[in-house]
């Protein structure tokens, strides 16, 4: 592992406007005011690590961007990262490359189910899960997470799995595929080994394939530990597709490269067949370079980033408790996305979404996007300089203070 002594300044504000940035440059195109402050989509307002930048500079200066494929150094970096950070010893042949996790979800849906089949998800959940299922003519079956509002203390999230309903739905709907979000976006749960074991045993009994979206696996707060679902029991690895990417961890979403781990050869071949049908073959040339550099030498940057995100989380918690007590923080165990319970404002989900934009001047992700149970919530991205977060909270406070 390469050690970097660079101290990163995450307080520095980088102007992202005018860079074709989805987060900042497309407000009007998406029906928002031009001056809205965005804390929605899950990328970060921080420049990448020095090692990634240097590696990309070298690749760009070479001047030729032809068809590319990863070599041993790439695979070794990916596998070493998983073993070092997630206690998972993987094999090169398990890895299937895709341009993104959502792309991989679509391939899995087509590989392992047929039109009309039911696929189970756990709302409120990352909204592309629902879209991918419906867009491929499958049916969404929802095992809604149970939410019990807590006192707002660190370490008390309030969300849990309804295991009885989970198994009942698998039986009644003849579920073939379950899409797990681990860590969970947007509610911030980092599922325990015991919870994952129970899910796995149920899926094993009912012969259900699990696609585990673990893209947020490197963001877990102190006191919690991410467990790769496929490592809980060797039997589970045989029916699991594990989706990972450097995009969330190292802010590389625009370079479009993901690593999908499929130990079972039969499942892997079926998945690869669906990838082949799309015509996708060679990954983004610069994505290969950035991913290798990130996993090989990005740990120091990531450690500093995690510390900064924790400071932002603590600041947000204290701000809400002291100045906007009507809005409740659902304590995240992981991810840099926080889930705000706005039910005490006494307005409908649709009214809440309009209030956030029109009165607070903010662009957040409205909770209804994540399923009906999310209507009273808003998702906020705290991976930004503290000054940006403070400005957003000040705008939110002013709007709540004036709410009639």
Feature roles, as predicted:
Residues 2-4, 8, 31-37, 42-58, ...:
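PLP-dependent class I/II
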Residues 3-19:
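N-terminal glycine-/charge-rich "phosphate-binding" loop or analogous flexible N-terminal tail
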Residues 13, 65-67, 229:
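Short clusters of hydrophobic/aromatic residues that line enzyme substrate/ligand-binding pockets
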Residues 17-34:
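An N-terminal-biased, well-structured beta-alpha scaffold segment characteristic
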Residues 38-43, 57-75:
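A glycine-/small-polar-enriched, mobile loop at the entrance of the PLP active site in fold-type I
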Residues 63-72, 78, 161, 292, ...:
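Short secondary-structure boundary segments
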Residues 66-99:
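Conserved N-terminal alpha-helix of the aminotransferase class I/II PLP-enzyme fold
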């Amino acid at each position: 592992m390469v050690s970097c002594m660079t101290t990163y300044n995450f307080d520095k504000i980088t102007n992202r406007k005018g860079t074709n940035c989805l987060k900042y440059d497309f407000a009007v195109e998406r029906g928002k005011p031009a001056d809205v402050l965005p804390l929605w989509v899950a990328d970060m307002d921080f420049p990448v690590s020095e090692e990634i930048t240097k590696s990309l500079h070298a690749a760009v200066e070479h001047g030729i961007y032809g068809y590319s494929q990863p070599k041993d150094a790439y695979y070794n970096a990916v596998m070493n990262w998983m073993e070092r950070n997630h206690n998972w010893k993987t094999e090169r042949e398990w890895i299937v490359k895709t341009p993104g996790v959502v792309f991989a979800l679509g391939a899995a849906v087509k590989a392992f189910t047929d039109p009309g089949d039911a696929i189970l998800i756990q709302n409120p959940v990352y909204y592309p899960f629902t879209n991918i299922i419906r867009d491929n003519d499958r049916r969404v079956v929802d095992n809604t997470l149970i939410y019990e509002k807590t006192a707002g203390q660190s370490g008390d999230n309030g969300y849990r799995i309804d295991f009885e309903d989970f198994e009942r739905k698998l039986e009644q709907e003849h579920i073939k595929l379950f899409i797990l979000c681990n860590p969970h976006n947007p509610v911030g749960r980092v599922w325990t080994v015991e919870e994952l074991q129970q899910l796995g045993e149920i899926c094993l009994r009912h012969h259900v394939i699990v696609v585990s979206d673990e893209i947020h696996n490197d963001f877990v707060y102190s006191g919690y530990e991410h467990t790769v679902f496929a490592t809980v029991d060797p039997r589970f690895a045989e029916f699991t597709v594990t989706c990972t990417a450097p995009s969330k961890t190292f802010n590389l979403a625009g370079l479009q490269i993901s690593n999908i781990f499929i130990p079972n050869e039969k499942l892997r071949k079926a998945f690869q067949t669906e990838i082949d049908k799309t015509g996708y073959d060679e990954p983004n040339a610069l994505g290969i370079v950035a991913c290798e550099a990130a996993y090989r030498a990005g740990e120091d940057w990531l450690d500093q980033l995690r510390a900064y995100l924790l400071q932002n989380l603590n600041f947000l918690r204290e701000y809400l408790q002291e100045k906007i007590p009507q809005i409740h923080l659902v304590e995240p165990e992981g991810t840099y996305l926080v889930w705000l319970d706005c039910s005490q404002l006494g307005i409908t989900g649709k009214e809440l979404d309009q209030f956030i934009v029109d009165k607070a001047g903010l662009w957040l992700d409205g909770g209804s996007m994540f399923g009906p149970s999310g209507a009273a919530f808003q998702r906020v991205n705290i991976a930004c300089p503290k000054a940006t977060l403070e400005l957003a909270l000040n705008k939110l406070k002013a709007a709540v203070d004036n709410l009639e």
